Amino acid sequence: KNERSGVEIQLDRSDFNFPTLVLGNFVNIIIISSRFIAGADGSNSIAFFMYAVVILNVLLTSVIGNVSTILLRKISIKKNTRLMIYSLLISLCIGLLMVVGLHYFSYDIIKFVYLRGEFNLFDVHETSSYLLELSFSFLFLFIATTLFQPFLTLPIGETKRVRLKMVVFFLLSIAFAAIYSEFNSFTSKESAVFVMYFSSINAVFLAFYSYIKYDQYEK
């Protein structure tokens, strides 16, 4: 029981449904998969990738994460299409501002944040290049993160099949991107960027599909 309210929360095995865990952490799965690809050749590319992702992920978790939390809280009580549209527009605007800002200031940002100790100007250049090239993929992740929230409020038991199909498609898209980049002799950087973009674009399609399912369920 909760000591303050005295309310007992009942947990069921379905609350730990694997597809739900995957869909709820799709951003981390995409980043980890791309990170693995970035370091596949044993070069420093993985370090530059992670330095860039740290900065992009801060914006994702601090701004888009809060927007999604508010949206999730509201629509779990009552369907609110207007709030959904507002949240999506906020995510889109923030993402576009980020892309434009990084186009002009990615080098300066990396230099200000990381240029110290062993981190030299070459590292600044390589990391800022990653930062700029990954920015659009994070714009897609911003959109997908917002769009997924309504679907995740639906009862797991009644949407289990849909969740499983979405997860299978999502994981296969990552596997396909990794295999495709491997057989096309991409550099580690090109492979990591390709996996990020291919997976994040597929995540947007899945997120739109999930919202359609949510809308059908709520009618």
Question: PLM ranges: what are they?
Answer:
Residues 1-20, 127, 157, 213-219:
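N-terminal membrane topogenesis motif
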Residues 140-147, 199-218:
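Hydrophobic alpha-helical segments of multi-pass membrane transport proteins
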Residues 136-165:
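Membrane-interface junctions at transmembrane-helix termini in multi-pass inner-membrane proteins
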Residues 1, 160, 169-205:
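Membrane-interface helix-loop junctions in multi-pass transport and translocation proteins
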Residues 61-79, 148-153:
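Helix-loop junctions and terminal segments of transmembrane helices
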Residues 7-72:
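Transmembrane helical elements of multi-pass membrane transporters/channels
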Residues 105-139, 189, 193:
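Interfacial segments at transmembrane-helix termini and the short loops linking adjacent helices
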Residues 50, 71, 79-96, 101, ...:
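Interfacial transmembrane-helix starts/ends
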